[in-house]
């Protein structure tokens, strides 16, 4: 397939088919640079050489009643993690200060559990208002399954974006968790959209799914019209049901990122958890398809040093998108 021609057709408005998407994942490895060139042509059309930086605050860790097979915080995990209840407001504000110092545009407040209590919502919204007043950061919340009235409260407090991943395909979902349904996840994204908050929803690749499942994930997110799509690559943690699963190669991960760029050309594609251990030395190439990364640590696993990420961007000739630019792009969605 002519990847450069396909990319140009995407820029002109073509929505690629499932067969074309599957061809991306099945493409010969020696076509990788051509595939990435096409993905970069699309990425550059909509985002230039700007990169959005995101940072996570793990505001509540562990104690989750759900049985997600990939997660070290789940009820079935035996992984030794640092579990704690919701942190105080001062800790959340300290994280925001650190994000501001590192020129991060989006600060992500994440809490474990099936969904937030009303008390959790009150606590988070109080912190969000202070962060907005003090640092002006864009705020993404990730608190679990959300009720409409909770979404409205978050919106009123100034939350810009809400993350709730579909994680995998509808077909593969019950192989990963049975404590909630795929529809529960999709419904939360719809609740977020209805409230006026920008929806963020993504995937975890490498959980024994098929290539067809990965294509289904991308098309589901295209249908959901998620503004931001975090693409995680499984970091198999000892003590979880998926421990020891290492199916991914750096080249396949790059094909996955390219797939999401071709299927969702105008969306923020973020290289998320597991990028260091799965992309390895090919991490920089991922940004030819994606336009966003997390810096710093993840929820229960360590990321690489922030200085290393900034060096990657400098070496690529890319620029960090400023907070002001991120606000402007959000208002345009």
UniProtKB/Swiss-Prot annotation:
Cofactor: [4Fe-4S] cluster; [2Fe-2S] cluster
Free-text cofactor note: Binds 1 [4Fe-4S] cluster. The cluster is coordinated with 3 cysteines and an exchangeable S-adenosyl-L-methionine. Binds 1 [2Fe-2S] cluster. The cluster is coordinated with 3 cysteines and 1 arginine.
Binding positions ([4Fe-4S] cluster): 64, 68, 71
EC number in record: 2.8.1.6
Residues reported in the UniProt entry to bind [2Fe-2S] cluster: 108, 140, 200, 270
A Pfam family recorded for this sequence: BATS
Enzyme class, first EC level, given as a word: transferase
GO annotation (BP), single: biotin biosynthetic process
Residue ranges of coiled coil: none
Catalysed reaction equations from the record: (4R,5S)-dethiobiotin + (sulfur carrier)-SH + 2 reduced [2Fe-2S]-[ferredoxin] + 2 S-adenosyl-L-methionine = (sulfur carrier)-H + biotin + 2 5'-deoxyadenosine + 2 L-methionine + 2 oxidized [2Fe-2S]-[ferredoxin]
Domain Radical SAM core stretches: 46-275
GO MF annotation, one: 4 iron, 4 sulfur cluster binding
Alphabetically ordered keywords of this record: 2Fe-2S, 4Fe-4S, Biotin biosynthesis, Iron, Iron-sulfur, Metal-binding, S-adenosyl-L-methionine, Transferase
Matches recorded under SUPFAM superfamilies: Radical SAM enzymes
Similarity annotation: Belongs to the radical SAM superfamily. Biotin synthase family.
Protein task: Catalyzes the conversion of dethiobiotin (DTB) to biotin by the insertion of a sulfur atom into dethiobiotin via a radical-based mechanism.
Protein name, as recorded: Biotin synthase
